[in-house]
Regions:
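Gly/Ser/Thr-rich phosphate-binding loop
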Residues: 1-26, 122
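Conserved ATP/PPi-binding loop(s) of AMP-dependent carboxylate-activating enzymes
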Residues: 30-36, 44-68, 104-106
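AMP-binding/adenylate-forming catalytic core of the ANL superfamily
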Residues: 51, 57, 79-139
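A structured beta-alpha segment of the ubiquitous adenosine-cofactor-binding alpha/beta core
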Residues: 72
Length: 139
């Protein structure tokens, strides 16, 4: 059809765009470069975003607001990294961590990403069951 699909990244609290790939500025696996005027930093693998488009807070919920807004930075709850060209890559979700009995934190998205590179794997979901990491793989 000749339609090119480009990834972007945004959330409601940030009205809504944080990063976007563009026709001439794109990178495979990335959600794009951070929007003009916006700032991203990574703290403990979590994506933080700062811009005048970020919400002021959650309506009548100062407790949650205080958890996600600190010194003007919005804590997205998403894991990722910026490369040297300022392209943002999403690697997982903070709330998706599997915590094993030995205290080890495992990101299911990292394992899923690796498994998807295997021949014959079309879809995969990684989860915890009985303190073991399990995967359902669909060819």
């Amino acid at each position: 059809m000749g339609i090119e699909v480009l990834n972007g990244y945004g959330i409601t609290e940030c009205s809504p765009v944080i990063a976007v790939n563009r026709n001439n500025y794109k990178k495979d696996g990335s959600v794009g470069q951070v929007i003009k005027g916006g700032k991203v930093k990574i703290v403990d693998n979590e994506i933080l975003f700062k811009d005048n488009s970020v919400m002021l807070g959650y309506y009548k919920d100062t407790e949650t607001t205080d958890m996600v807004l600190k010194k003007g930075w919005f804590y997205t709850g998403d894991y990722g990294y910026l490369d040297v060209d300022n392209f943002l890559f999403i690697t997982g979700r903070k709330k998706n961590l599997i915590i094993l009995s030995n205290g080890e934190n495992v990101s299911p998205e990292v394992i899923e990403s690796e498994l998807l590179h295997e021949e014959g794997v079309c879809e995969v979901i990684v989860y915890a069951k009985d303190n073991k990491i399990m995967a359902s793989i669909y060819p």
